Structure formats: C-alpha cells, structure tokens
C-alpha cells in the first residue's frame, strides 16, 4: 500500500510538470532556453563543473516557475475579482521566477561567452 502511494506521488508530480508546460507560456520559454543551453553546452564542450552549474540553474528556474504556477492557480481559485493582495501574491511569485531567470542568464553568459570568443 505504501509503495502505491509513493508511486502515485511521482505520477501527481509529473502531471503537475506536464500541466504547467501545457498551460504556461513562460514554462515553454524556460524549457526552450534549457534545450538551447544543453545544445550549446554539447557544441562548446563545457566542463563537468559547468554542466553541474547549468543543471542546478535549470532546476532553480523550472522549480520557481512551477511554484509560481501553483501560487497563481490558488489565488485564482480563491478570487477572480480584482484584489490588491491577490495581485501582490502573484506579482511577488512572478518576481521570484524573474530573479532566478536573470541570475541564470548572467551565469550562462559567464560560462558561454569566453567559449564563443575562443571560437572566433
């Protein structure tokens, strides 16, 4: 019985990821950026440490977007009317994603720009 509950928790988690991908344009954008970084990493032969950094950053951005989606969904479930506190909650959650994405982009530039310059 416990194994079934454990396996179901993975099923529910994957359903959440898939739902977020299907319904959120920003999640699609983050996944696209992740795929492009993976391709660039392969082509530019980034180091093992650089791969680890990229995977950590992928995890942070995707996790932040999933949490943002959950917060937005809960807020919308509670009220669809204009409400300043609901707006603050949604804006702050979106801001957390933006901070992660900007930080990840900066680190990505630090990793990839020298490699691109070396090719030129």
Name these PLM-found stretches:
Residues 1-2, 83, 89, 104:
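A contiguous, well-structured "functional interface" segment within a domain
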Residues 80-96:
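Juxtamembrane helix-capping/reentrant segments at transmembrane boundaries
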């Amino acid at each position: 019985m416990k194994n079934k509950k454990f396996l179901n928790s993975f099923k529910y988690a994957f359903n959440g990821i898939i739902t977020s991908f299907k319904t959120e344009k920003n999640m699609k954008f983050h996944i696209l950026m992740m795929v492009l970084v993976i391709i660039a990493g392969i082509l530019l032969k980034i180091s093992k440490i650089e791969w680890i950094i990229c995977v950590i950053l992928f995890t942070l951005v995707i996790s932040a977007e999933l949490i943002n989606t959950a917060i937005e969904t809960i807020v919308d479930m509670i009220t669809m009317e204009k409400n300043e506190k609901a707006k603050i909650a949604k804006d702050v959650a979106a801001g957390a994603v933006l901070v992660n994405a900007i930080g990840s982009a900066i680190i990505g530039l630090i990793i990839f720009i020298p490699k691109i310059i070396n090719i030129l």
